Amino acid sequence: MSKLRGPDGRIPDRLPDGRPAVSWERRWTEGTLPLWLVATAGGIAVIFVLGIFFYGSYTGVGSA
C-alpha cells in the first residue's frame, strides 16, 4: 500500500508538509466530463423533446 493512502485506502487532502495532495488544476478536471459537452448534449435533448411535442401537435389526436 502507498504511503500517501490512509488506512481506508483514500488519498488524504493534504500531504504531511501541508501542501495539497492534488493540485487545484487537476482537482476539478480529472475524470470529469467537460461542461460544454454536458451542455451541448442537454441542449440537443431539449430540442429533441420539444420537436416531439411540436410534431405531436400537428399530427395525431390534437391535429383537428
Curated annotation (Swiss-Prot):
One of its GO terms (cellular component) is plasma membrane-derived thylakoid membrane. GO terms for biological process: photosynthesis. Belongs to the PsbJ family. This is Photosystem II reaction center protein J. Residues 1-20 are annotated as: Disordered. It is a single-pass membrane protein. HAMAP family: PSII_PsbJ (MF_01305). It is found in: Cellular thylakoid membrane. Pfam families: PsbJ. It comes from Prochlorococcus marinus (strain MIT 9211).
